[in-house]
Amino acid sequence: MEQEIIDFISEHHVASVACCEENIPYCFNCFYSFIKEGSLLVYKSSFNTRHEQILEKHKNVAGTIVPEQVEVATIKGVQFQGVLLNDGIELAMKASASYYSRFPFAMVVPGKIQVIELQQA
């Protein structure tokens, strides 16, 4: 991944993520942290959401990241494709540490930490 894209992803904190089930797309927005090693996008999701149900079966995602304050004349953004990972306790601990260090208030909100491995951005 190019350094300019890594820097852009690292500077921002909201992503729009899309998943799909039976050719029906579904999108959601989330706060994220980024782990450069492995190109991992970490987010937290409430339990029993529609996107969590879809991602249980279909791990492929796509999404966008744009600045929180968009200037129409100079809009920039990153589009990505990736896959949801379920790689055990070590990844879960690393992802949780990354996410909660960026969003400590999220510790009191019920939900599940999820990890997207970016395959293209």
Region locations from a protein language model:
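Short beta-turn/strand-loop junction motif enriched in small, turn-promoting residues
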Residues: V14, E68-V70, A121
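Helix-adjacent hinge/juxtasegments
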Residues: H51-L85
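Charged, gly/pro-rich active-site loop segments
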Residues: K76-A121
